[in-house]
């Protein structure tokens, strides 16, 4: 990917290489002018995510019968993607009707195909999300809902590292310490939280649980970072059109999961409606709403804010699971919540003051190259100006001594 710099004297265009991971200029402008409306949107996003993310493990737990699922978890994920696709299509139709005179329609075949090519990167997070959504059900076989949410908070640390490597995001020293404190808080909650004397897949429960935890933390972290990267790199594209591509890829991957399940377990397992109840219908709607809300986080806010809002949802999940299912809130859980809240306060209150938009950081090499070009242009301007304002008999004399 490259850009051009035009000389103001000779109008020659010079190719300037840009960082491959650069965020779009449209998002750069958007982020540099954050208004009170944007802050209100962040509060609304966090509040909605706290409720939806807090309900998710509760609903999954309610769907279990005798400690097992009567339905295929992949079928829930597939129906969730279909629900989100329907929502995206409805919003696109509404948005298309509100186009002003002179605005380019985005539902034409040529525009749609061009947008599909530009947003092909969304297939990467869609694949990771398909794997992660299945892992959410598997994790419920090892931990209670409150513990699942605490384990999910480990994603913040992994996401921070991925953001620094992939999107060149900058963090202050205190922010890194806050993330380390978050890891300590989660570890406190895990002390003596695993059941003893049981096993699964032929492995001791601790080994199996920690193996799933590794995937449960890494896969969604990769999905979130690549989702933010894909959405912001095409910031001018309608978010509902981007969601349509993302959910379309997700539906394809989950359908492949259903086919693989049918091959392994037999054709009878291909019935996507088998074993579902009212609880699973609520779960599908909740997962769809949570996925739609997440896309607004990734495009208009950032991944770290999304994960910290999920951390706040831990309190809601812990209290709700204690009230509904009689799970005990141990002293470890209370201490862990306290540490996590302190960590979140430290992280949000110690951001880099002179932080510039990530796109400017990622295009630092291009700006440096442009500064060198501007020096040449300024020298050319000064010489041209001097030549223009020469008067008298010597106006045809050379600018430089012979």
Curated annotation (Swiss-Prot):
Keywords of the record: Golgi apparatus, Membrane, Sugar transport, Transmembrane, Transmembrane helix, Transport
GO biological process: transmembrane transport
Lumenal side: 64-73, 140-146, 192-202, 265-280, 343-402
Transmembrane domains' residue ranges: 43-63, 74-94, 119-139, 147-167, 171-191, 203-223, 244-264, 281-301, 322-342
KW Ribonucleoprotein (keyword) present: no
GO CC term (a single one): Golgi membrane
Membrane topology category: Multi-pass membrane protein
InterPro entries for the chain: Nuc_sug_transpt
A Pfam family recorded for this sequence: Nuc_sug_transp
Sample GO molecular function, one term: pyrimidine nucleotide-sugar transmembrane transporter activity
Subcellular location field: Golgi apparatus membrane
SUPFAM superfamilies hit by this protein: Multidrug resistance efflux transporter EmrE (SSF103481)
Cytoplasmic topology ranges: 1-42, 95-118, 168-170, 224-243, 302-321
Predominant location category: Golgi
Cited function: Sugar transporter involved in the transport of CMP-sialic acid from the cytoplasm into the Golgi. May transport important nucleotide sugars such as CMP-Kdo (2-keto-3-deoxy-D-manno-octulosonic acid) in physiological conditions.
Family per similarity comment: Belongs to the nucleotide-sugar transporter family. CMP-Sialate:CMP antiporter (TC 2.A.7.12) subfamily.
Name of the featured protein: CMP-sialic acid transporter 3
Source organism of this protein record: Oryza sativa subsp. japonica
């Amino acid at each position: 990917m490259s850009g051009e710099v035009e000389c103001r004297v000779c109008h020659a265009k010079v190719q300037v290489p840009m960082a491959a991971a650069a965020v779009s200029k449209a998002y750069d402008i958007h982020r540099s002018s954050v208004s009170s409306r944007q802050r209100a949107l962040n509060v609304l996003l966090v509040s909605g995510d706290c409720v939806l993310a807090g309900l998710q493990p509760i609903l999954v737990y309610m769907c279990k019968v005798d400690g097992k699922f009567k339905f295929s978890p992949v079928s829930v994920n597939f129906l969730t993607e279909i629900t989100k696709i329907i929502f995206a299509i409805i919003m696109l139709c509404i948005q298309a009707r509100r186009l002003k005179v002179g605005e380019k329609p985005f539902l034409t075949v040529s525009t749609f195909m061009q947008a599909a090519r530009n947003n092909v990167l969304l297939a990467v997070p869609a694949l990771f999300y398909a794997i992660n959504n299945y892992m959410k059900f598997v994790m419920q076989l090892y931990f209670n809902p409150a513990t699942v949410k605490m384990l999910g908070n480990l994603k913040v640390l992994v996401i921070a590292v991925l953001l620094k490597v992939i999107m060149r995001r900058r963090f202050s020293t205190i922010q890194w310490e806050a993330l380390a404190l978050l890891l300590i808080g989660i570890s406190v909650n895990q002390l003596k939280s695993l059941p003893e004397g049981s096993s699964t897949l032929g492995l001791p429960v601790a080994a199996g649980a920690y193996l799933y935890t590794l995937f449960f933390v890494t896969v969604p972290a990769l999905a979130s970072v690549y989702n933010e990267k894909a959405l912001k790199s095409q910031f001018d594209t309608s978010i509902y059109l981007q969601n349509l591509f993302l959910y379309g890829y997700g539906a394809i991957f989950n359908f492949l999961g259903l086919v693989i399940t049918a091959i392994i377990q037999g054709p009878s397992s291909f019935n996507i409606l088998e074993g579902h109840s009212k609880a699973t219908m609520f779960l599908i709607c909740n997962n769809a709403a949570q996925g739609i809300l997440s896309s607004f986080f990734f495009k208009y806010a950032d991944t770290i804010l999304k994960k910290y809002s999920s951390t706040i949802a831990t309190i809601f999940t812990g209290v709700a699971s204690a009230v509904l299912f009689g799970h005990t809130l141990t002293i470890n859980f209370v201490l862990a919540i306290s540490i996590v809240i302190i960590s979140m306060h430290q992280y949000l209150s110690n951001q880099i003051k002179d932080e510039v938009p990530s796109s400017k950081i990622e295009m630092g090499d291009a700006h440096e190259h442009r500064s060198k070009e501007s020096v040449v242009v300024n020298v050319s301007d000064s010489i041209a100006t001097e030549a223009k304002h020469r008067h008298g008999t010597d106006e045809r004399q050379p600018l430089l001594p012979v």
